[in-house]
Amino acid sequence: MQVINLKKYEKLETIYQIWNAEYGNIYPISAELFNRNIENIYEKASYVAVDDGKLIGFVIGKVWHDVYKIKGYDEIGWISLIYVTPKYRKQGIGTKLLSMCENALIEYGVSIINLGKDYNNYFPGLPIDLVKIQPWFQKRGYEFTYQTHDLISRTNKKISIKNNYFKFISAD
């Protein structure tokens, strides 16, 4: 098994593909979403784990490095996404990826590391459907702070549009 920097990994599409193989039915990551979210990663905190040329895990770390300063954000690092394929779990790979990411974030100077809820995030934290993973993070020093919820509005409500607001033009 080899760990390499994410920016040096040439098959980036396999990152969201292995995620989607397990979680795509509830938390799909499209190519567009993935590419948008890795634009602002912290390279020194983002890695992939490869075994015989096959991607088996990854971690994506972020720090605030936008030109617009937000008070307190310079003290925060984020673990945007972390994953190890089922076959390779319970072998210390996730722990190694997490540790490498955390060490890079600490070296950068952050004093708080959040799981998720980064800007341009995939998740606002640990998804409720993945609650079985929570003890793994707690064992590594992460604390449950609060729960967030997705809110849904149904769009099947009838909307009335009056013709006097629009001018209809025919193709003739």
Regions found by a protein language model. Give the residues of each.
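Acyl-donor-binding surface of acyltransferase catalytic domains
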Residues: S99-S170
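Alpha-helical elements of Rossmann-like donor-binding domains used by nucleotide-donor carbohydrate transfer enzymes
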Residues: T14-I18, K96, M100, K132
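Short amphipathic alpha-helix that is part of the acyltransferase structural core
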Residues: M1-F34, Y42-V50, L55, T145-I152, ...
